[in-house]
Amino acid sequence: IRNATLLVTPDVTCGMEQVYWSIPDMYVEPVTFKASQNVSNYPVIGVELMPQRPRSFYNAQAVYSQMIQENTNQTMVFNRFPDNQIFLRPPESTITSISENVPTQTDHGTLPIRNSVSGVQRVTLTDARRRASPYVYKSIAVAQPKVLSSRTF
């Protein structure tokens, strides 16, 4: 299926979409996010650029392209983070890039963990429209515990 799938990424920066990391069962929500069990509203603990390399671009302003986007895109495109002003973005442009996936590894730093952690954890990657990202084939999050102060005992 990878040989026959064409990935297109409409974005105002011509392919520099972002990936939002959410691990709702393990980490405490950042101050500007509320706890949620809805994928489109998961609290975001890390942001990075989508691991893609744009190769070619085209203008998706044709009526057919607009009709497809109206019928398939979610309505929360323009305000995905109503409680976090940093993540507000303008509407998408008509420039679309055809991109290739590239492997990536990131470190999101030290994050506060919940007091009670269950055995199974969800790792969710969402794209700039807060959908579960179809562009990433495999993802894994590794947590390395660290005690920062005696207050945590």
From Swiss-Prot:
Q: Which residues form the signal peptide?
A: none
Q: Where in the cell is it found?
A: Virion; Host nucleus
The record's listing under InterPro entries reads: Adeno_Penton_B (IPR002605)
Report the principal subcellular site. Answer: virion
NADP: present as a keyword of the record? Answer: no
- Output the superkingdom of the source species: Viruses
UniProt keyword annotations, A-Z:
Capsid protein, Host nucleus, Host-virus interaction, Late protein, T=25 icosahedral capsid protein, Viral attachment to host cell, Viral penetration into host cytoplasm, Virion, Virus endocytosis by host, Virus entry into host cell
Give the matching Pfam families.
Adeno_Penton_B
Q: A GO CC term?
A: T=25 icosahedral viral capsid
GO BP terms: namely: endocytosis involved in viral entry into host cell; virion attachment to host cell
Q: What induces it?
A: Expressed in the late phase of the viral replicative cycle.
* Further information: All late proteins expressed from the major late promoter are produced by alternative splicing and alternative polyadenylation of the same gene giving rise to non-overlapping ORFs. A leader sequence is present in the N-terminus of all these mRNAs and is recognized by the viral shutoff protein to provide expression although conventional translation via ribosome scanning from the cap has been shut off in the host cell.
Protein's job: Major capsid protein that self-associates to form penton base pentamers, each in the shape of a pentagon, situated at the 12 vertices of the pseudo T=25 capsid. Involved in virus secondary attachment to host cell after initial attachment by the fiber protein, and in endocytosis of virions. As the virus enters the host cell, penton proteins are shed concomitant with virion acidification in the endosome.
Subunit record text: Interacts with the fiber protein (via N-terminal tail region). Interacts with the capsid vertex protein; this interaction binds the penton base to neighboring peripentonal hexons.
The UniProt entry's sequence similarity note says:
Belongs to the adenoviridae penton family.
**Protein name (Swiss-Prot/TrEMBL):** Penton protein
Q: Which organism is it from?
A: Bovine adenovirus 2
